[in-house]
Amino acid sequence: MTGARVTASGWGWRHAGRARPAVSGLDLDIRPGERVLVLGPSGAGKSTLMHALAGVLGDDEDGDETGELLVDGRRPSASRGRVGLVLQDPDSQVVLARVGDDVAFGCENLAVPRAEIWPRVGQALADVGLDLPLRHPTSALSGGQKQRLALAGVLAMRPGLVLLDEPTANLDPEGVVEVRDAVLRSVEASGATLIVIEHRVAVWQHVVDRIIVLDPAGGVLADGPTDTVLSTEGERLAAAGVWIPRFPPSPPERRDRSEVPAAEVLLRAEGLVVGRVPFARKRAVAVAGDLDLTLESGTATALTGPNGTGKSTLALTLAGLLAPAGGHLAAADALAAGLGPAPHRWRSRDLLERVGTVFQDPEHQFLAGTVRGELAIGPRALGLGGAAQAERVDALLHRLRLDHLADANPFTLSGGEKRRLSVATVLATRPRLLVLDEPTFGQDSRTWSELVRLLAELLDTGTAVVAVTHDDHFVDALADARFVMAPAAGPASAGAISTGTIVPASVATPTTAAETGAP
């Protein structure tokens, strides 16, 4: 198999109902077999380009196209069998109930002989480090495991063009290296062309041939060999919001502890067991237990650890959206404010002003047809009047750089914009406790800094923050402590579950090649 060639001539796309194009004036020529890292500030159109190359962007009703974009000299819609795409949101690519069937699905659509499919499936799962039975339910996978599953499905198809949109965003550091190396082995063996969108430049900089930086104003900011772009354009790109290894983000300024309100206990877990109810089951299956954790006002706790250890399940339980599977979880009076101690028994309106939750997938919490409408839902539910409601919404639109998208459909935003909107919807109700799942996913360095600065200000006024994260910059900037989840000491079939331990925030996770930028 040979790699696919990608060409663009004055190409652009404007989503229906949007005044500004997502991409405009794009000229590209990517040769067969090239490995390209695509960078750019949040909202520069990176994901739009990937969807277009995969032939899934939509038709005339979904937007207006200008110029020409070709894969092997044909429109992308005519080249779908040659292209494999891993999306930002892994949930959107899980189509079948069992792991093996899901990976085999693409091969079946390409009419790969049956005798060849299952060896491909097994190899792809091994390559991405998803060591699970073929019959394992996809509904029981964590976000990071679903990301590996989506990649395995693409690698099993052996396409001529591999498109990866933030493929390591939800992975732990070891998983980042494992997945990157699996991709490299696959494209080396097949000769496929590789195009990657990734904010972690250090992960890919030594293994790609070329970097292309998209300009939000249209066209390309920089294009050339990796070392050349990073050395000659690094400072300019960092100023534009592109993550450059030599220019780490600056931590926010924090108020002196003597000026911050005294800490109050908000929520306490003792011997807590957390779990979920799998599809077609009636009882929760425990995924982590023996968890002791105290959350206090004005403090930030980072939930860290490998994929699949139950971090998101713990976060949802602390937020009152899942009932504990065992142990003890109680809200103190400072949070309950007259309600009972069990958050999962509170009404949704009661949760609104006490606990705000940002899901791992932003789209799971969008309800309105516009960004402005989305931000107004919480304040309206709290009974805020028109003027006060509009003032609060406008302030958040401005603070999180969403002003120009106020009338846009939330589902047409970029991944980074969706994440900022999901955080803003929670901030709109001003809860005492924020529970955030991967809050910095998809952010460029400027929007990352603004988001972290906003959370720091909330901490200084007494809001408590709990965040599931693999972002060590975020931990260093905000966290007072880490709650580190550890994998089960035995197989799940034998009843083994994950555990967790609280440690100082300064205790770092083991350094990996992903963090140092080594290949």
Outline where the language-model segments fall.
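Conserved ABC ATPase "signature" region
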Residues: A115-P133, A387-L405
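ABC ATPase C-loop
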Residues: L155, V426-L427
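The feature captures the beta-strand-to-loop junction immediately N-terminal to the Walker
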Residues: L39-P41, T304-P306
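Conserved ABC ATPase signature
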Residues: P137-L141, Q145, N409-L413, E417
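ABC ATPase NBD Q-loop/coupling interface
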Residues: T66-S79, H328-D350
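Catalytic Walker B motif of ABC-type/P-loop ATPase nucleotide-binding domains
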Residues: V162-E166, L434-E438
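Hydrophobic anchor residue at the start of the ABC signature
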Residues: L151, V179, V423
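Helix-to-loop junction immediately C-terminal to a conserved catalytic motif
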Residues: A54, A319
